[in-house]
Amino acid sequence: MRGLFYLKLLAWVVLLSLCLLMAHRKTKVADKFRALRSRIQSRFNRRIRLNDSFADDLENGLHSRNFDIISENSNDARGGLDDISKNEIKKIMENDNIDFDKARLLYMEKKFGQNGIAPDGTPIDPKAFTFDK
């Protein structure tokens, strides 16, 4: 009788764990389906309307859910990231084996440091004066 109780308890714990895992991975799965949909559309010659720079970035993996370049960029005149930044971010992604968002964050923090800005956006210069709210 006690063994049956523990077996049921174990089954509920496993079921709850699977539900939590699925809820956590839901956004990743949605991103995978979106990428698969765009791949299928491109195979049937249904092009995604992007300007050329964004299309190259998409093919090279320089996008994420937070840096969405798929949605409504056909009339966007901006060129996206410059070539030097793209190459630096790709190197960071390959060397550190991290995703695009983390690589872009590391790149921006490095650029901030080169320009006298702390990673949180405050100036590093000790003579700088900032106003509190």
Curated annotation (Swiss-Prot):
Keywords: Signal. InterPro entries: DUF2015. Disulfide bonds: none annotated. It comes from the Eukaryota. Residues 1-25 form the signal peptide. Belongs to the UPF0357 family. This is UPF0357 protein YCL012C.
